[in-house]
């Protein structure tokens, strides 16, 4: 069983660095394509300020020169979902579960264990980078599929932009999750609720060592409970009354 989570734009580098591992050929090809952009070209590519583009240019060039600082990916990313994941003071069993079951899907690194070394970078599958004439999704599809082909159960906490990198055969094995708030009988869903809830849900999976869909259905976390009436066999819905 594997649990898939996306990367995040926000990062925290105020951490002890760890040793880098060599880039896969597929990752190196993406990096080589990114490294062709000047700082001013990155400004329009990323749709960011000149200052931010310069920072990203320096990150890319540091990776290219193999001088970039690397950090455990789960701790480097610091978006709303990540800030709601239990990342410190894990028991030995929780640490083992995290290492064996939780994987991050990255447009630069591929599908990798959550504590893999990553350097600060900005890239997702909505960005129009061409790698040897292919889109990022086409470039990664075979590698993404290979990472999961032996899995019977895949818990996806990904957005559709990441899920669609995988083939239909792999996506057919995915269990997806939706998190909603019940405000006086009105069911609400928005990105802030979803991101926080994904982090809290992953924490509950880790703490309870969940291995099956049945075990996931029984979880109560951060006020969320499973709603069978709203769910599908491979699309679980959790609702929090507020």
UniProtKB/Swiss-Prot annotation:
GO terms for biological process: response to hydroperoxide. It comes from the Bacteria. Transmembrane segments: none annotated. GO terms for cellular component: cytosol. InterPro entries: YaaA. Pfam families: H2O2_YaaD (PF03883). NCBIfam families: PRK02101.1-4. Belongs to the UPF0246 family. HAMAP family: UPF0246 (MF_00652). This is UPF0246 protein SPCG_1533. It comes from Streptococcus pneumoniae (strain CGSP14).
């Amino acid at each position: 069983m594997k649990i898939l989570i996306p990367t995040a734009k926000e990062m925290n580098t105020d951490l002890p660095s760890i040793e880098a591992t060599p880039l896969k050929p597929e990752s190196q090809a993406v990096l080589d394509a990114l490294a062709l952009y000047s700082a001013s070209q990155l400004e329009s590519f990323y749709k960011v300020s000149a200052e931010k583009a310069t920072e990203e240019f320096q990150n890319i060039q540091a990776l290219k020169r193999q001088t970039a600082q690397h950090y455990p990916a789960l701790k480097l990313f610091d978006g709303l979902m990540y800030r709601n994941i239990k990342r410190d003071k894990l028991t030995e069993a929780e640490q083992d579960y995290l290492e064996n079951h939780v994987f991050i899907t990255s447009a630069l690194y591929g599908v990798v264990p959550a504590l893999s070394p990553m350097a600060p970078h900005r890239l997702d599958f909505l960005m129009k980078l061409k790698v040897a004439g292919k889109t990022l999704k086409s470039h990664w599809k075979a590698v993404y599929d290979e990472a999961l082909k032996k899995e019977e159960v895949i818990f996806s906490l990904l957005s559709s932009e990441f899920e669609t990198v995988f083939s239909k055969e792999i996506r057919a094995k995915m269990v997806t999750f939706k998190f909603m708030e019940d405000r006086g009988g009105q069911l609400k869903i928005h990105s802030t609720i979803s991101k926080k809830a994904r982090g809290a849900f992953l924490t509950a999976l880790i703490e309870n060592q969940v291995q099956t869909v049945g075990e996931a259905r029984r979880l109560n976390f951060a006020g969320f409970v499973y709603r069978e009436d709203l769910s599908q066999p491979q699309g679980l819905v959790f609702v929090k009354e507020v």
